[in-house]
Each structure stands twice: as C-alpha cells, then as structure tokens.
Amino acid sequence: MNVQERRNLNAAVERHTSDHVSWYLSSIGRIPLLTAEEEVELSRKVQLMMALLENPDAESNSENQAVLQAGQRAKTKMLKANLRLVVSVAKKYQNQGLELLDLIQEGSLGLERAVEKFDPALGYKFSTYAYWWIRQSMTRAIDNHARTIRLPIHVSEKISRIKKMTRELTHQLKRLPSRAEIAEALKLPLQDVEMLLSQSTPCTSLDAQARGDDGRSFLGDLIPDPKSLEPMDAMDRHIQHEQISTWLAHLTEREQQVLQLRFGLHDGEQHTLAEIGRRLNVSRERIRQVEARALQKLRVLSQQPLCPEAC
C-alpha cells in the first residue's frame, strides 16, 4: 500500500466516523426544543415518578401505574429534547482521550441524572442545571476510562495517527508491527514514536478490581505501603525495643523517666526540656543534666554485645 492509498484509507475511516456523528446530529436536530412551561410540566411528572420509585411501600395500583407511565414518557421527552446540549458540551472535551460519540454517550448518562433530580421550583432553567451533570459525567469518564493526565491537542492528534497506522499495518502484515515499522510508515523519527506511545499509556485506577477468586481485591490493595514495616523490619524493631528496655533498666528511675518523655519511648510523643521540667517540678537545666548523664550511660552499654548472656 503506497502513501496515497494510506491517505485514502485514513480519510475513509475519518469519513465513516464523521458520518455517524453527522447522522446523529441530524437526527436530534429534528427534535423540537421545549418551552419553559413544558419543562416545568414534564419535570413535575418526573418528580412524581421518582417519588414513587424511591418509596418501597408505595402500592402497585392503577393510579400509581399511571403516574409511573406518565413520568417515564415525560423523562424520555426531556432527554430527547436536550441531546443537543450533550453534543455541545461533548465538543468541548474532544481530543482528551475519548471519541466524540463516547463523550456523547457518557454525557447522556449525566443528562438522565439531571432529568431525574431537577426541581423546577428552584427557579432556574433546566439547561443550566443539566449542564453541570453532563460535564461531570464526561470529565469522570475521561479520568476513569481514558487518562488521568490530559494531553495537548497536537499530541493527541499524533497519537491518533499512530494508532490508525498500527491497525493498518497489523491488517497488512498479519501481525503487530514494530515501532520502527510504524515510524517508517508515518515518516517520523523512531524516538518520536516511542515518546508518543509512552504518553498514550492509560493510567489505571487504584480502585480497579484485580483478578482474583473472590473478585473483591483492588489494585491499590496490592501496592505495599511505604510506611508499613516488612516482617523482618518489624522483627528488628521488636529486638531493638527489647534491647533498649534492657539498657534503660541500668538507669535510675529519674533517668528512665526523663528519656522516656524526651524521646517518646512509651507513647511516641516527644517533650521539650522545659515541658519535662515543669512536669517533674525541676529546672530545665536540671533535666538537661539528667539527660546527658543517662545518654552517656547508654553509650557505654551500647558498646557491649547485644546478647551478653549468649556470648
């Protein structure tokens, strides 16, 4: 396949996607917009429906069934009449990881949520309220399913070209192409292709489920906490704690008390010399002297074997 044929194929793929979007826009463009009075009337019917659906004790009689049916018809009418708003918002978030049709689909979910929660008594237009829900749904989708870090538009366009060429070469070669082959086909330096591909790697949420038998493990659970101790480290800490306790036993009661407060040996809370002095009703200088004498004794003890009984 020569360069011109590749360009023709890429153009055909782009036209195919564009045709789908154009058809969709043409379809929703024929749906009439709602007046302010219609919005209020339909929203009230939806509210009545939602109140029944959220009430588990509601009776399933003919009157309630009529309310549910009227509410569903009103909801559908509001959704269809506001799809143009979804498309308008979606266009603002193109080239950030999701295709336009995917953004429209995600935005439609936000629109549905807005229809269900809108209260016309608040006094503002439905489109103002729905815009927030639509935008939130799209941005969450971009973060969760596309990228956490948004790329500049020109970088996203280059990555799209690489992905298209990868599909084309895979079909042509009956295998996955190498990065060098992709770079040659696109007439780009290999290092540029490698850099762009590294940037296109999607970020995975730590809340994503990890494969397992119980289905309840998440990726975040498998990442070690740098603040937690490994078993051997914990054992070392335990031995050190016991050794310090042995050394402290060689000190006077006052010396032990001062070091325990000074270094937080019991509760982890360290105190200043002045604080210890006030607690023990002596001067700050006196506490400093006791601390210095106690530390000197510990230096002597620390030079002895760790387990003199076993040596």
From Swiss-Prot:
InterPro entries in the record: RNA_pol_sigma-70_dom, RNA_pol_sigma70, RNA_pol_sigma70_r1_2, RNA_pol_sigma70_r2, RNA_pol_sigma70_r3, RNA_pol_sigma70_r4, RNA_pol_sigma_r2, RNA_pol_sigma_r3/r4-like
Membrane spanning stretches: none
Residue ranges of the motif Interaction with polymerase core subunit RpoC: 102-105
Keyword Transcription regulation: yes
Segments for region (Sigma-70 factor domain-2): 78-148
Entry superkingdom: Bacteria
GO biological process: DNA-templated transcription initiation
PROSITE patterns, sorted: SIGMA70_1, SIGMA70_2
Keywords carried by this UniProt record: Cytoplasm, DNA-binding, Sigma factor, Transcription, Transcription regulation
Compartment list: Cytoplasm
Alphabetized GO MF terms: DNA binding; sigma factor activity
Family membership noted in the UniProt record: Belongs to the sigma-70 factor family.
Primary role: Sigma factors are initiation factors that promote the attachment of RNA polymerase to specific initiation sites and are then released.
Protein name: RNA polymerase sigma factor SigA4
Record organism: Synechococcus elongatus (strain ATCC 33912 / PCC 7942 / FACHB-805)
Lineage of the organism: Bacteria, Bacillati, Cyanobacteriota, Cyanophyceae, Synechococcales
Gene: sigA4
